[in-house]
Every structure is written in structure tokens, then in C-alpha cells.
Regions:
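Mid-to-C-terminal secondary-structure elements
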Residues: 47-62, 66, 71-175
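Peri-transmembrane interface segments
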Residues: 146, 154, 159-162, 173-209
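Structural beta->alpha junctions
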Residues: 1, 15, 30-37, 108-114, ...
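Short aromatic/basic micro-patch
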Residues: 1-4, 43, 74-75, 126, ...
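Glycine-rich active-site/cofactor-binding loop and its immediate structural neighborhood
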Residues: 212
């Protein structure tokens, strides 16, 4: 299992990593009045935007304070807006519900469209990872950690560094198997990649099963 300590160690000790975000996610129905649609909510920090090449087109991104407070705020993709605000209303400042949890929309993502795998990159909700952990999933661990290497050339070093950090944190003895998986963007692009920019080296440390969508 990946813990917050793993994330903290990576951001304090990893020299080949330029951005790093905890990741927890959940799929379910999102509701606004009489409108509802299936979608996924991703609990992340601000670095996730850089790693996955997302940007806020309207409104703003949530803050470190929102993360500390596990605030019920979110940034939504264009598809979510179209599904929930069918009359073209401005979604900013409106409250939607994911499961039983109300979220105030503070930002709308710049549309990215579909990726090469045919996945809609605008059908998602981004929220502070603490909010998704505590209020939706009721867990303290992380489902994944997304990171990007300082350059494509350094991706091998970044993977080696992450492996060493996690093995030490998890107290894995020499010769014993890892209890985590690390996938690079190259591997993911042939599996479950959700980004069209294959030049971005995305290193995902996934505990147990790969919860990568």
C-alpha cells in the first residue's frame, strides 16, 4: 500500500522528479438538480495539472489550504459541465453532488478532447486528494502517485530513484520483490494511458492493482 509518507519522501528526496501528486479516485454518479451522469472524481494536488497537461480555463484551481481543510471544492471538465448544465448555465460557484458529498465548482478545465485510446479527457472531476480520501473513500492510504521526470532522458534514473525510495520506505529486503508497480509513460501508452502527449514521462507508482484510468 502506498502511504502519504511515500509521497512525502519522494518530494523531499527525489532529485529526478519535477512534479509529484498523490492520486485517489472514485467512480459514481454526479448530480445537479434533475441532471445526473456517471463520471470519475480524482483526488489530486496542483502538480497533477502539470503532469497531465491540464489547465484551468475558467475560474481557479484549488489551493494548499483547500487540501489541508479537505474542502468540498472541485474543478470540472467540459463534458461534466455539458451533462449537468444542459441549459448553458455558468457552472462556476454552483454546487453539484458526487454520491452524497456536495462540491462547489470553482473552476472549469480547458478542454482536451479525446485521447488516442478514445477516452474522453474532459469527463472528470478534480478535487483535493484529502477530500476524496476522507469524504468519499474513507481511506488514509493512496491508490497511486503520479510523477514526472525532470526530462525524458532522465526517466530511467527517475524510475530507479523512485524504486529505491519506495523499497526503503516499505522496508523491503534485498532480493525480495517490490510490493508496488512503477509504470512509465511508454508502458502506459500501450496499456491504459489517458494522455496524448507521450513525450511527458509519467511515472505512476501504483499499489497493488493499477488504478490508472
Amino acid at each position: 500500500t502506498l502511504k502519504m509518507e511515500d509521497y512525502q519522501t519522494i518530494i523531499h528526496e527525489a532529485s529526478y522528479i519535477s512534479a509529484c501528486s498523490p492520486v485517489v479516485n472514485s467512480s459514481g454518479q454526479v448530480v445537479n438538480g434533475a441532471n445526473n451522469a456517471p463520471t470519475s472524481v480524482y483526488g489530486i494536488n496542483q502538480d497533477y495539472m502539470e503532469i497531465r497537461k491540464y489547465s484551468v480555463g475558467e475560474g481557479e484551481m484549488f489551493t494548499d489550504q483547500d487540501i489541508r481543510r479537505a474542502a468540498k471544492v472541485c474543478v470540472v471538465g467540459k463534458t461534466v459541465v455539458e451533462n449537468l448544465f444542459t441549459n448553458g448555465e455558468d457552472p462556476l460557484g454552483k454546487t453539484i453532488r458526487f454520491g452524497k458529498i456536495p462540491f462547489k465548482i470553482i473552476g472549469v478545465l480547458t478542454p482536451k478532447g479525446y485521447n488516442s485510446m478514445g477516452q474522453d479527457q474532459d469527463d472528470l472531476i478534480l478535487a483535493p486528494y484529502t477530500t476524496v480520501q476522507k469524504r468519499i473513500l474513507a481511506i488514509t492510504y493512496l491508490q497511486g502517485i503520479f510523477a514526472s521526470a525532470i526530462s525524458e532522458e532522465m526517466s530511467g534514473e527517475a524510475i530507479d530513484e523512485l524504486t529505491a525510495i519506495l523499497r526503503q520506505n516499505h522496508k523491503i529486503k534485498a532480493g525480495d520483490d517490490d510490493d508496488f508497480n512503477i509504470r512509465s509513460q511508454e508502458e502506459l501508452s500501450s496499456m491504459l494511458s489517458s494522455t496524448t502527449d507521450l513525450m511527458t514521462i509519467l511515472l505512476a507508482c501504483i499499489a497493488g492493482i493499477s488504478l490508472l484510468v
